[in-house]
Swiss-Prot record:
Classification via InterPro entries: Ribosomal_uS4, Ribosomal_uS4_bac-type, Ribosomal_uS4_CS, Ribosomal_uS4_N, S4_RNA-bd, S4_RNA-bd_sf
Protein name: Small ribosomal subunit protein uS4
Keyword terms: Ribonucleoprotein, Ribosomal protein, RNA-binding, rRNA-binding
Organism: Bacillus anthracis
NCBIfam families: PRK05327.1, rpsD_bact
Record region (Disordered): 22-42
Length: 200
């Protein structure tokens, strides 16, 4: 399944979650798009709830189904809870951490920064958004890209960097000090439903 490239606001309303992280998509119309307005939602089956939860998380991180399932399978080989490990692996993606650093206002914009070669890991350019960052590695903006308008604008409005990143705003770099804990990850996601979905 290909990555969704349509209007993020429409997908956010359909899934009932802000994919941009701003919450603006749901302010005026917190219901799915369509001609029937706020009264169109039907009660979902158990399978429907599981599928919806999977789609929420997959689209939140901007992944294809193949990438998503591969990461899920990798998480299942780790010690500990499958669902929590899955969330931790998703959070360690390079494009996501660029977003968490505040260098981009959305994950989609962060993915573009990585794709276009503006991001470095431990001093080497990495242009693979799915690159999994390891604790202790440093993420930075290429010196030639320090004055990008999109980066400057994103930093101006960002007021939160998670505790598993130590961010130096002057150098535009952060160290991924440790893996995220479940309490630091999206509370609106019930990963147990996703484990159930793939275990059917």
């Amino acid at each position: 399944m290909a990555r969704y490239t349509g209007p993020a606001w429409k997908l956010s309303r359909r899934l009932g979650i802000s994919l941009s992280g701003t919450g603006k998509e749901l302010e005026k119309r917190p219901y799915a798009p369509g001609p029937h307005g706020p009264n169109q939602r039907k009660k979902l089956s158990e399978y429907g709830l599981q599928l919806q939860e999977k789609q929420k998380l997959r689209h939140m991180y901007g992944m294809t189904e193949r990438q998503f399932r591969r990461t899920f399978d990798q998480a299942g080989k780790m010690p500990g809870k499958h669902g929590e490990n899955f969330m931790i692996l998703l959070e360690a993606r390079l494009d996501n951490l660029v977003y968490r650093m505040g260098l981009a206002r959305t994950r989609r914009a962060a993915r573009q920064l990585v794709n276009h070669g503006h991001i470095m890991v431990d001093g080497a350019r990495v242009d693979i958004p799915s690159y999994r960052v390891k604790p202790g590695q440093t993420i930075s903006v290429r010196e030639k890209s320090n004055n990008l308008v999109v980066v400057k604008e994103a930093i101006e409005v960002n007021n939160f960097v998670p505790e598993y990143l130590t961010f130096d705003a002057d150098k535009l770099e952060a160290t991924y000090t440790r893996h995220a804990e479940r309490a630091e990850l999206p509370a609106e996601i019930n990963e147990a439903l996703i484990v159930e979905f793939y275990s059917r």
